[in-house]
Amino acid sequence: MQKISNEIFLCSICNVSSGDCPEDCKYCTQSAHYGTQIQRYKNKSIDKIVQEAKTLREYGALGFCLVTAGRSLESQKCEYIAKAASAIKKADLGLHIIACCGSADVDSLKYLKTNGVDSYNHNLETSKEFFPHICTTHTWKERFETCENTLKAELGLLSGGIFGLGESWGDRIELLKHLQILSPHTSPLNFYIANESLPLPMQTLSPQEALECVTLAREYLPNTRLMIAGGREAVFGDNQKPLFEAGINGVVLGDYLTTDGKAPKDDVAMIESYGYVAATNCH
C-alpha cells in the first residue's frame, strides 16, 4: 500500500488562467455565475510560470500543475500549456509536470505529452448520480471520458473528488468505485470550503467526517497516492497529523487556485514535525 512509506509527495499548483469560467459548478469560485471576489486574469507569462516552478522546486515540490479555468482544452489553450510545459522542461528542474485544463480529446492530450506534460488531472468530483445537483453545464460522463482519454494518450492520470457538497456516503462510495476503475496514479482529495457567494450551504465537514472520507478512499484505492488538497487547513487547522495517519501521502504545497494556503516552508516544517519527509522522486 502507498501509505507504508514515510515519504510525502509535494505538489504545487500554478493557476495560469483564473476566473470567468462559463461552467456553473456550485462549489467553484472561478465560475462566472456567482460573482465571487477573486483575482481574474488570462494567461500568466511563461517566464513567470517558470519562475514559480523554480521557487516551489526549491521548497521540495516534485509535481507542478498548470491549471486553467474554463470548460475544455481548446486549441489556443492547448498551445499555451504546451509552451509553458516545454519551458519548464528546458529549465531542467526535475519536476513532474501536470496539466489540469478541463475536458480534452486524445489528440490534444498527446500533443501536451510531446511537449513535456507528464500527467493530466481531471477530477470526477462526486458520484454520477449526485453530479447534476452541483453542475448543469456539463456532465459527469464527460469527465469520465476525459479521464479515459488521458489513459489512451498514455499520460499519467490524476483524478479525485471533493467532499462536503451535500453528497451522501453512498455517493462517496460510488465516486471511489469509479476511481477504482480508472486506477489513477494520484487521487486529489478536497474538502469543500464554504463561501457566501456560492449557492451551496455554508457548512464545513467536521474533522472526524473528513478523516472517515480519507480512510474510505484509502480502503478503495490502496495503491493510489492520496493527495490532500483544498480544504485541509479549513477543516483541520494546525492539527493535520491524523490525515497522514489515515493514509494521505501527498500534499498540495502552498496556495490553491483562489484560496491561500500555508507558506511552503511552513508546510514542509509541519510534515517533518510529524515524522515524515518530502519524497525525492515521483515513484
UniProtKB/Swiss-Prot annotation:
Gene Ontology biological process: biotin biosynthetic process
Annotated S-S bridges: none
Domain Radical SAM core intervals: 3-232
SUPFAM superfamilies: Radical SAM enzymes (SSF102114)
CDD domains attached to this UniProt entry: Radical_SAM
Reactions that this protein is recorded to catalyse: (4R,5S)-dethiobiotin + (sulfur carrier)-SH + 2 reduced [2Fe-2S]-[ferredoxin] + 2 S-adenosyl-L-methionine = (sulfur carrier)-H + biotin + 2 5'-deoxyadenosine + 2 L-methionine + 2 oxidized [2Fe-2S]-[ferredoxin]
Signal peptide: none
Residue numbers binding [2Fe-2S] cluster: C65, C100, R225
Family, similarity comment: Belongs to the radical SAM superfamily. Biotin synthase family.
Function: Catalyzes the conversion of dethiobiotin (DTB) to biotin by the insertion of a sulfur atom into dethiobiotin via a radical-based mechanism.
UniProt name for this protein: Biotin synthase
Lineage: Bacteria, Pseudomonadati, Campylobacterota, Epsilonproteobacteria, Campylobacterales
